[in-house]
Amino acid sequence: MAETVEVLVPGGKATAGPPLGPALGPLGINVKAVVDDINKKTAEFNGMQVPVTVTVDDKKNFTIEVGIPPTTALVMKEAGITKGSTEPGALVAGDLPLEAAVRIARMKFDGMLSYDLKSAVKEVLGTCVSVGVTVEGKKPREMIQAVNNGEYDGVLVA
């Protein structure tokens, strides 16, 4: 029967230490090979925590599935910040172009509850509220209202 290990690793910088090593060691597979493969697959997410699922079958073969980092991590990377605001709504941690919010929405679309790109972008803008990031210099709630009013329909074409 296949064993599955789900972990959150730093993109491109996974090591054989915790959380991977202790989880994979008892399964009897080459942990270094798994770590090298994970680092190759997560290199584009450098500096972000990435969800990874390692499945090991009875013959000690492994497959690696790389998830998409949390929306918060993607927003912070696109905004060029390492931490969100300590007081979202009062202190601004950074600014995000609307195009970046659309790009994040497209990246995360399959895992979202939204039916269309417009709703997915509003979900990303909601995350911006929590992180304390403005969008195009506006507060995220103002931007959500503008999206609802159709001001950005040209940008939000799927």
From Swiss-Prot:
GO terms for biological process: translation. GO terms for molecular function: large ribosomal subunit rRNA binding; structural constituent of ribosome. The keyword Lipid metabolism does not apply. Keywords: Ribonucleoprotein, Ribosomal protein, RNA-binding, rRNA-binding. Forms part of the ribosomal stalk which helps the ribosome interact with GTP-bound translation factors. Belongs to the universal ribosomal protein uL11 family. This is Large ribosomal subunit protein uL11. It comes from Methanoculleus marisnigri (strain ATCC 35101 / DSM 1498 / JR1). The gene is rpl11.
